A protein has these predicted regions:
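Conserved beta-loop-alpha segment that forms the PLP phosphate-binding cup at the N-terminus of a helix
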Residues: 4-29
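Active-site pre-lysine segment of PLP-dependent enzymes
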Residues: 46, 59-61, 73-133
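Conserved PLP-anchoring active-site segment centered on the Schiff-base-forming lysine
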Residues: 24-44, 51-55
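Structural motif
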Residues: 32, 64-68, 98, 140-142
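Conserved PLP-binding catalytic core of the aspartate aminotransferase-like
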Residues: 186, 194-228, 246, 250
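PLP-dependent enzyme catalytic core of the Aspartate aminotransferase-like
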Residues: 81, 227-228, 237-275
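PLP-dependent aminotransferase class I/II
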Residues: 10-13, 17, 120-203
């Protein structure tokens, strides 16, 4: 991930393990979560007894802050310069900045890793999302050496399996593959957005790994897609939202196109061979 050295990285059996570990390791009592976002962050802090506030923008640096960058589900991105300035102000009161960069492999330009180490900043990275190997259970916390040692002590020995270490090391070293994969994902995401807008959905945001769309009849569309064997994500925060991931083989693209066209009463889009 471009860190200055291995003493800035703690390995874990998935980012979720780190999300649950941070409240007990840091002990912060007042935490803001930039939302709406991945619900497990707020849940972990609330379970620790912390006072948690969901905020729509960067709050004053009078408490610790957790955000996902780029955000899940809407792809919102916060400039790393703003985050660095916030962290420096918050450091004066011993507050933490935790940035979950689970989807930053497709947005390396917004990563906070290049400014590390900062004493009060922790960056989380997820191996499985970009590499398509969620079941491998491999995640990382990037932070100042002292915090890395605390997290490693909390994780305990043998936190990461041998296969995860071997596969992760090989995959992360293959930067040529990563560059090609970013280009491939961008092409396929353009195709997916075409399908969705052609079926009358609005695009709220997203990344090249997922897209958040809205529709006045989102629940009806959700049930229609389930009937076609297609599962998308619904959200309590907004009943009009649906999050779509990228289809895989061409038959999955065809099935999605057919289902969307049937719902919208349109003709399926001819195969454009987006790559």
């Amino acid at each position: 991930y471009g860190t200055a050295g291995p003493d800035l990285i703690a390995c874990a059996p998935g980012t979720q393990a780190l999300i649950q570990a941070l409240p007990r390791v840091l002990g912060a009592r007042r935490v803001a979560v930039l939302g709406p976002t991945y619900a497990e962050h707020a849940a972990a802090w609330r379970a620790s007894g912390a006072e948690v506030a969901e905020v729509a923008d960067l709050p004053p640096p009078d408490r610790s802050l957790v955000l996902v960058n780029p955000n899940n589900p809407d792809g919102r991105a916060v400039d790393p310069g703003r985050l660095t300035a916030w962290a420096r102000d918050a450091a004066e009161a011993d507050h933490w900045l935790i940035v979950d960069e689970a989807f930053a492999d497709v947005r390396p330009d917004i990563s906070l890793v290049p400014v590390l180490p900062l004493a009060n900043v922790i960056v989380l990275r997820s191996f499985g999302k970009f590499h398509g190997l969620a079941g491998l259970r491999l995640g990382f916390a990037l932070a100042a050496p002292r915090m890395v040692r605390r997290l490693e002590a909390d994780m305990g020995p043998w936190a990461v399996s041998g296969p995860a270490q071997d596969i992760g090391a090989r995959a992360l070293a293959d930067q040529a593959w990563a560059a090609a994969e970013r280009a491939r994902l961008a092409v396929h995401m353009a195709r997916l957005r075409d399908l969705l807008t052609g079926a009358g959905l609005g695009i709220v945001g997203g990344t090249d790994l997922f897209v958040l769309a809205d529709h006045a009849e989102a629940l009806t569309l959700y049930e229609h897609l389930v009937g076609a064997g297609i599962l998308v994500r619904r959200f309590r925060a907004n009943s009009k939202w649906l999050r779509f991931g990228l289809p895989g083989p061409e038959d999955q693209w065809h099935r999605l196109d057919k289902a969307l066209s049937a719902f919208a009463g349109t003709t399926p889009i001819p195969d454009r061979r987006h790559g």
